[in-house]
From Swiss-Prot:
It comes from Homo sapiens. The modification Phosphoserine is found at residues 539, 1054, 1087, 1114. Residues 356-742 are annotated as: Required for interaction with CCDC22 and VPS35L. Residues 937-1341 are annotated as: Interaction with phospholipids. GO terms for cellular component: cytosol; early endosome; early endosome membrane; intracellular membrane-bounded organelle; nucleolus; plasma membrane; WASH complex. A motif (LFa 4) lies at residues 482-491. The gene is WASHC2A. A motif (LFa 6) lies at residues 572-583. A motif (LFa 3) lies at residues 450-463. This is WASH complex subunit 2A. The keyword Manganese does not apply. Residues 357-1341 are annotated as: Interaction with VPS35.
Length: 1341
């Protein structure tokens, strides 16, 4: 303050001058001791001035720098101008120098001379002129000679020869390139350029003579080189073309050959002139046309002889070999060409560019390539018929296949197979007797054919050639023998090669048994690689194959538990065994089974010999017509085998599947089985054959397992051998056996409740699956289950086909459920064919031989695929919606416990709805027996329907349409109509309708329900179902689309944690399927069992199981009744929840359930209700069954459970419907568990619970809820429409909450997971709250 005051006072008088002027540095220093405001002002002025000066100086410097830049740019511009001047000068000088070459001077000299001459007297001019003219003319002539190249006037103009000077001047004077022989002129500006006047041009005259002569020689050599190059180019061109043609079946190779022939003929003229050059071109082409022809003829003969053994083994091998040989000829062609072309010599090099592509082979092989390939296609068959030759050729062909990348050559082999293999299949139809053996060799790899049988054969052949390469000929042969067309060749190869092939197959089977031990690992690798390779060709099929090969690989591990059963597969299907190393592991048993398979193959061979009568067995028509019994049966068994590999791949039916796989993967075994079965088929019917296959697969396949199975298997065999009544009788027996085995299953299920689903699954797998395998063999429901399983896999596999295939899968699942035997007889073939139709959307593109391949590959492609779904439907039968299950089967297959569930369920569902029947068997074995016989009747009715389908592509399309006569029945319509309420409102519910309908109507209207869906809601139901199914099968762990679904997915993840408790699912399944017998019906009665049972009865009417399906569904109805709040989720849940949701929910609850379920399963609903109170607390499982109706009181528990998700939905949903939340909670838990992989789980489950509580009568809606699993949201809209007043608000909340709280559910998903993992009751509350609004929506009504 003092300083301020003082300065102010001091500066007061002088403040203005001090403040206004900038201070000097000296003043600032002086005032530093007594700083004042004036000093601040002065300092500010000083700083401002300094800043301004600095800025001004900076600007000045900037201007200077800009000036420098401008100057620099100007200098640069001038420099560039100089450069340009030099460039212009260089151009000018160069031109001047060139023109200045004596030529310019000469005319000038001439002109001067002329002028001088003019000036002189005429005499003088003449005198002077003569020498000058002579000199000029001579010089000009010299210039013309030296500077110009006088094209041969003789060649150019014969007339101009007379006028030498004129002709030469006027005509063909071409300036010579002076710099051919001499260096270019010096660079302008170079030292030499500056130093020498001629700038490097003056030496021309001295060099002209040598230049001219050199030029002539050089030009000649150049012309020769050009000619050679053109020849070589032509050779390369023809080679390239031939490469393309070779890939294209070398149809155009003849053109190349023709080109080579003509080129050679044209070149022959040149050869006449330039034989010397042609000797050089010999490298690329024959010395002369005659030599080339001789060489080609000899080369063709030799090449054919050499190639046919190598390439003839398979049309594939030949294209491969053609490519490889061509490539090899190009480079390695020395050996082949030495042999092939050794006489002409022509042409290793000639054809190494030419030869491999065009040379020998263009002339010989190219020309004959078509013939060779085609003849190879045909001659392959004869040579392949020669077992030794085919084996040897096979080795060579597979070796070439090895040489050729599986991807690349296989692709072309795909093409060649399209042409060679595909056309070979077409040729196979007539020639398959011939070709099958060849195909054996090429298609040894068909192990992949397991799934793709014929597609696989082509694809697998493409890929199998590489794949079979590891196993090489032996494996390839054995697999090829069995799998030559795995389905087609099985019959045709066996038919054609039945003596040879049978012997070789028997030997090969033995070799396989041996090799499979060693090769099983490689083959397992192969199948995956094959399937992978096949992916390129058949993405869908390969997906299924990959799904199955990979799944089968894992399943094979599980199935390896079934080595005894697997050995049969091993012996019969090396590659399938390869595919299922499960079987590969059991090499010894494989050998034993191989013996069985060999016996079967021998029987097959006899059958095939019989079929040889119609060697066209695989001609689509014949195959479909008479081969349908065998072929379809084979397809069915293939479907089973394919589905079964997956089932066996899955732990669920690993043994049963392994046994099934034995038949399934032993498509040959099945063929062998079919051989036996075919014999029996011929003796009995397809039905018996189907069951023969089952019996055979059950006996042979189950032969090792049949220890427990044999009585039933024998019964099955007897039944299958019995008249077509086998279906009904067999199913009745199966019903009895199924009841027994179901009772056993129930016991084992109870045990599983006690021991946990895993143990039970395994024990059931071993015991029940053996039984169920027997039953399944009896029912072929094992195969229907395996087919469902394949279907389940198929959805996974079929992404493209999924819409149709899934619909087909649903139909097939339902049909399988409806008619396990129908599915055996029909489901396999029709299913295979319908799916193959789907496949052949791809395969038809791939292979023109759609019919044959539809017959074989259809079954094969979708035998595996379809059958997988079929297997899953049996699994799904428990789940009610196996198709949905199949959709979720990938998810299910992911959780082994779920798979085990499936196994148990499959065991139960092995009788197409033994799962349902299992509860029914608990409820009453009578119903099961009744229902199954009814199913057999329906199956008989439907089986003929579908049996017809496979015969024609139309039938296949119909199968794809999943039109069930039963579905068209009024009862089916009524059932569908019940389900419909959900369907029309909900696009997804339509798919869910199928699912739930599949649950309900899988037993009753597997086909009709699907047909009902497809007809009542044709577009939505089928398309949506398939689309949802496709998604679902992709669903694995796909994140649910809706918040609610995501919430459920979160719960699923926690339930996935809960999956550690597999017992719960088993217990729950047993309870859901068994104990719900009482309880689910109670729930159903409570929750609308009337409508559900009406729907069931209506749906059952087609099955003649009106009451039984009601009861039969009551397992589902039980699940549905309970699952309305609870079981319906399990219906969708049981389809998925039992498989997945129940599994995980019961995993959550398994402990409480397991404790209670062992006692409760017989008690059914009541025991389960008490269980579910505990379970409701422990998990949503109790609520799933009981809380739907009994458990509304458990709102509180759901709220605790929902606390996690309740946070999401609690405020709105819990308040609105705690009861709903309880039942839906359980359902959600179940569904969440079910939909651990669920995308649609939350959607489907939430609507399921809503639907359950809204209308227990909507059990069809519950089935729709199963569909809702796919179309959860769509179900919700229905529910909204149903209880629009409260439901809308609730659904606004529910939908909004489902979505908004679904978002919350997303946040609470972790909570749900932790809640499920740790506080399971909380999880139920979450579920309840999640579904609180849906439950309230139902409850509100």
């Amino acid at each position: 303050m003092m300083n301020r005051t003082t300065p102010d006072q001091e500066l007061a008088p002088a403040s203005e001058p001090v403040w206004e002027r900038p201070w000097s540095v000296e003043e600032i220093r002086r005032s530093s001791q007594s700083w004042s405001l004036a000093a601040d002002a002065g300092l500010l002025q000083f700083l401002q001035e300094f800043s301004q000066q600095t800025i001004s100086r900076t600007h000045e410097i900037k201007k200077q720098v800009d000036g420098l830049i401008r100057e620099t740019k100007a200098t640069d511009c001038r420099l560039h101008n100089v450069f340009n001047d030099f460039l212009m000068l260089s151009n000018t000088q160069f031109i001047e120098n060139r023109v200045y070459d004596e030529e310019v001077e000469e005319p000038v000299l001439k002109a001067e001379a002329e002028k001088t001459e003019q000036e002189k007297t005429r005499e003088q001019k003449e005198v002077d002129l003569i020498p000058k003219v002579q000199e000029a003319v001579n010089y000009g002539l010299q210039v013309l000679d030296s500077a110009f190249e006088q094209l041969d006037i003789k060649a150019g103009n014969s007339d101009s020869e007379e006028d030498d000077a004129n002709g030469r001047v006027e005509l063909i004077l071409e300036p010579k390139d002076l710099y051919i022989d001499r260096p270019l002129p010096y660079l302008i500006g170079s030292k030499l350029f500056m130093e020498q006047e001629d700038v490097g041009l003056g030496e021309l005259s001295s060099e002209e003579g040598s230049v001219g002569s050199d030029r002539g020689s050089i030009v000649d050599t150049e012309e020769e080189k050009e000619e050679e190059e053109s020849d070589e180019d032509f050779a390369h061109h023809s080679d390239n073309e031939q490469n393309r043609h070779t890939t294209q079946m070398s149809d155009e190779e003849e053109d190349d050959d023709g080109c080579d022939l003509f080129a050679d003929s044209e070149k022959e003229e040149e050869d006449i002139e330039d034989i010397e050059e042609n000797t050089r071109p010999k490298r690329s082409r024959p010395t002369s046309f005659a030599d080339e022809l001789a060489a080609r003829i000899k080369g063709d003969a030799v090449g054919r002889v050499d190639e046919e053994p190598t390439t003839l083994p398979s049309g594939e091998a030949k294209p491969r070999k053609t490519l490889k040989e061509k490539k090899e000829r190009r480079t390695p062609s020395d050996d082949e060409e030495d042999n092939l072309f050794a006489p002409p010599k022509l042409t290793d090099e000639d054809f190494s560019p030419f030869g491999s592509g065009g040379g020998l082979f263009s002339g010989g092989k190219g020309l004959f390539d078509d013939e060779d390939e085609e003849s190879d296609l045909f001659t392959e068959a004869p040579q392949d018929r020669q077992a030794g030759a085919s084996v040897k050729e096979e080795s060579s062909s597979s070796k070439p296949g090895k040489k050729i990348p599986a991807g690349a050559v296989s692709v072309f082999l795909g093409d060649t197979d399209v042409f060679g293999a595909a056309s070979v299949p077409s040729m196979k139809e007539p020639q398959k007797p011939e070709q099958p053996t060849p195909r054996k060799s090429p298609y040894g790899p068909p192990p992949t054919g397991l799934f793709d049988d014929d597609d696989g054969d082509d694809d697998d052949d493409f890929f199998s050639a590489p794949h079979s390469k590891p196993s090489k000929t032996g494996k390839v042969q054995s697999t090829a023998d069995i799998f030559g067309d795995e389905e087609g060749d099985l019959f045709k190869e066996k038919a054609v090669a039945s003596p040879e092939a049978t012997v070789s197959q028997t030997d090969e089977n033995k070799a396989r048994a041996e090799k499979k031990v060693t090769l099983s690992s490689s083959k397992n690798l192969k199948p995956s690689s094959e399937t992978k390779t096949q992916k390129g060709l058949f993405s869908d099929e390969e997906d299924s194959e990959d799904l199955f090969s990979s799944q089968s690989a894992s399943k094979l591990k599980g199935a390896s538990l079934l080595p005894g059963k697997l050995p049969t597969l091993v012996s019969l299907f090396d590659d399938e065994d390869e595919e299922d190393n499960l079987f590969g592991g059991t090499a010894a048993k494989k050998q034993t089974l191989c013996l069985q398979a060999q016996r079967e193959e021998k029987a097959k061979a006899s059958e095939l010999s019989k079929k040889k009568a119609s060697a066209l067995l695989f001609s689509s028509d014949e195959e479909d017509q008479w081969n349908i019994p065998a072929s379809q049966t084979h397809l069915a068994s293939d479907s089973r085998s394919k589905g079964e590999p997956r089932d066996s791949g899955t732990l669920q039916s690993q043994e049963a599947k392994a046994v099934k796989k034995t038949s399934l993967f032993e498509e040959d075994e099945e063929d062998d089985l079919f051989a036996i079965a075919k014999d029996s088929q011929k003796k009995t019917q397809r039905v018996s054959l189907l069951f023969e296959d089952d019996v055979d697969s059950g006996g042979s396949l189950f032969g090792s397992p049949p220890t427990s199975v044999p009585p039933a298997t024998k019964k099955k065999e007897t039944v299958s051998e019995a008249p077509p009544l086998l279906f009904s009788d067999e199913e009745e027996k199966e019903a009895q056996l199924g009841v027994k085995s179901v009772d056993k299953k129930v016991e084992s299920a109870k045990e599983s409740l006690k021991f946990g689903r895993t143990d039970v699954a395994e024990s059931e797998k071993e015991g029940l699956l053996t039984r169920s395998a027997q039953e399944t063999v009896k029912h072929s429901d094992l195969f229907s289950s395996s087919s469902p399983w394949d279907k389940g896999t198929k959805p996974r596999t079929k992404t493209v086909l999924s819409l149709f295939d899934e619909e087909e899968d649903k139909m097939e699942d339902q049909n399988i459920i409806q008619a396990p035997q129908k599915e055996v007889g029909k489901g396999r073939d029709p299913d295979a064919h319908p799916k193959s139709t789907g496949v052949f959307q791809d395969e038809e593109l791939l292979f023109s031989h759609k019919l044959q391949k539809d017959n074989d590959p259809d079954v094969d492609l979708f035998a595996g695929t379809k059958k997988t779904k079929l297997l899953e439907p049996s699994v799904g039968s428990l789940f009610g919606d196996d198709e949905d299950d199949d959709l979720f089967s990938s998810a299910k297959s992911q959780p082994l416990v779920q798979e085990k569930k499936r196994v148990v369920k499959k065991d139960h569902s092995v009788d197409s709805f033994k799962n349902q029947k299992h509860p029914e068997s608990i409820q009453g074995s009578k119903e099961k027996g009744i229902w199954k016989p009814e199913t057999p009747q329906d199956s008989s009715g439907l089986a003929p329907f579908k049996t017809k389908e496979p015969s024609t592509r139309i039938g296949k399309i119909q199968a794809n349409l999943a039109i069930n006569p039963a579905a068209l029945l009024p009862t089916a319509a009524s059932q569908i109509s019940e389900v419909k309420p959900v369907l029309p409102e909900l696009a997804f519910p339509s798919s869910e309708h199928r699912r739930s309908h599949g649950l309900e109507s899988v037993p009753v209207l597997p086909g009709s329900g699907e047909a009902g869906v497809s007809f009542d809601l044709p577009a939505q139901a089928d398309t949506l179902h398939s689309a949802n199914k496709s998604r679902v099968k992709m669903r694995g762990k796909r994140r649910p689309q809706t918040r609610a679904a995501r919430r459920l997915a979160a719960q699923e993840s926690s339930e996935t944690e809960d999956m550690s408790v597999p017992r719960g699912p088993i217990a729950q399944w047993a309870d859901g399927a068994i104990s719900p017998n009482g309880h689910r019906p109670q729930l159903r009665a409570a929750s609308g069992e009337d409508s559900t049972e009406e729907a069931l009865a209506a749906a059952a009417a087609p099955w003649e199981g009106g009451p039984v399906p009601g009861v039969d569904r009551s397992p589902f109805a039980k699940s549905l009744g309970h699952s309305r709040g609870e079981a319906d989720l399990f219906d969708s849940g049981d389809i998925f929840s039992t498989g997945t949701g129940s599994q995980s929910v019961e995993r959550t609850k398994p402990k409480a359930k397991i404790a209670e379920n062992p006692a409760n399963p017989p008690v059914g609903g009541k025991a389960k209700s008490p269980m579910f109170p505990a379970l409701g607390e422990a998990s949503s499982d109790d609520d799933l069954f009981q809380s739907a109706k009994p458990k509304p009181a458990k709102k509180t528990n759901p709220f605790p459970l929902l606390e996690d998700e309740d946070d999401l939905f609690t405020d709105q949903k819990v308040k609105k419907n705690e009861t709903k939340s309880n039942s839906q909670q359980d359902v959600i838990l179940t569904t969440q568990d079910i939909f651990e992989d669920d995308i649609f789980a939350t959607e489907a489950i939430k609507p399921s619970q809503k639907t359950r509580e809204k209308e227990k009568t909507l059990e069809s809606n519950l089935f729709d809820d199963n569909i809702d699993i796919f179309a959860d949201l769509t179900v919700k809209p229905k529910e909204k429409s149903k209880k629009k007043v409260e439901a809308k608000s609730i659904f606004d909340d529910d939908m909004d909450d489902i979505f908004s709280s679904g978002i919350q559910a997303k946040t609470t998903k972790p909570k749900s997971r932790s809640a499920q993992a740790a506080p399971e009751p909380r999880f139920e509350h979450k579920v309840s709250n999640i579904f609180d609004d849906p439950l309230n929506a139902f409850g509100g009504q």
